[in-house]
Amino acid sequence: IFSGGPSSVYNSEAPVPENKIFNMDLPLLGICYGHQLIVEEFGGKVKRANKEYGSSILTIDNDSDLLNGVGKSVRAWMSHGDEAEEIPSGFKIIGHTEGAKAAAIASDEKSVYGIQFHPEVVHTEQGTQILKNFVLKVCGAKQDWTMKGFIDTAVEKISKIEGNVLCGVSGGIDSTVVALLIDKAIGDRLKCVFVDNGLLRLNEEKEVEEMFKENFKVNFTSVNAGNQFLEKLKGVEDPEAKRKIVGEEFIHVFTKFAEKEGPFKWLAQGTLYPDIIESGVSKGPAAMIKSHHNVGGLPDWLNLEILEPLRELYKDEVREIAKILGVPEKLFMRHPFPGPGLSVRIIGEVTPTKLEISKVASKIVEDELMESGFYTKVWQAYAAVGDDKAVGVVGDERRYGNIVMIRVVDSIDAMTADWTRLPHEVLEKMSNRITNEIEDVTWVTYTISSKPPATIEPQ
């Protein structure tokens, strides 16, 4: 399977596989850039086209093994700027969208297929069926991989490592599952440390400590390093700089802890595959969208090896593991929270005022979602704040205050997301509470951009 990517096939530095792959009579599926690669390699032509991002209707034009059973039309997720102008000889068009006349092509005889859309994202209807058709029907593979099998394999691999493991836990499902897998494998050789970086949700440091002590029998301790992180972030506005500073400070905290409580040979992290893809360090030429504090390797001066048992999984798969490991539903259904914390939900410099606004406003958003029954139905929700201000009227007096942006999205794996259509009365209650309970806020807005083109977090 040739995946999508940011390159154009007519660029001199465009990534291509070894040419012999095209002459080995192997089933091939090209997705987005991979689709254009197949068109080019088999003698067709690719051209620069109008950019097409987001949802489109794919109309099925001809029968094929690839699109078998998907219906006459489906909603497909697009993210491209090139398209096939001429398809290769021996291929047929099996599907089109309004913006791409050859959105799906096939050579059933060669078992070679190209699709301009992304079947791997949840917003593409029947996307899983399309991938199943290729893997099972075209390639003849068997479905014998299970989450239970993954757990057994991971525990077996971890049990063979030597030395003690230091695991950074945040209270989120990713690092919690990592801690439980390692504990299952090596027991007392694991030490979990929670770092209060001053960028957490309201009362989170207390809630995380209680959660671990009440639910899990692992070695757990916490470190208060809030002042250290906030001091380093003073005057910093660039989002990438903030992310890198947070990542570096985590390493400094872990290093100091390891020197005092060690020896440790390993540092375990809850890195997932979307983190790796967005950081541009996956096995391929993915574009760097934003760095992640736990991705990219460790600095040379840190004498610890990295352990990332979940680095090839997505969030929905991690939640399945959590269920199998007996994690209470309340814990594994918590909304994802970024590693750099509120620093990436605060646009511009992290200041005490903006930090407090983000904490309190986000808590109000979560409370109202729980009250209305929407919390477990959405993927993620929070309130962001920047430097923009607007005039308001409070108690018949003019007030110049901050603008808060509410963000609520639906997703499965965080690779794509759609903004949630909340009832107006829920949004109204959020807005009223935020402006009434936070003196510095005068306006509340609701963000209605999907991913792509936006990202889930603002920075």
Language model segments and positions:
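Glycine-rich, N-terminal phosphate-binding loop of Rossmann-like dinucleotide-binding domains
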Residues: S3-G5, V169, T271
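Active-site beta-alpha loop architecture of Rossmann-like, nucleotide-cofactor-dependent enzymes
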Residues: S7-S8, P274
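Helix-terminus/capping and membrane-interface signal
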Residues: L29-H35
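Structural motif
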Residues: I1-S3, N62, A268
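Glycine-rich phosphate-binding loop
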Residues: F264-P274
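RNA-binding accessory domains that recognize and position tRNA/RNA substrates
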Residues: S8-S12, V16-P17, F22-M24, Q36, ...
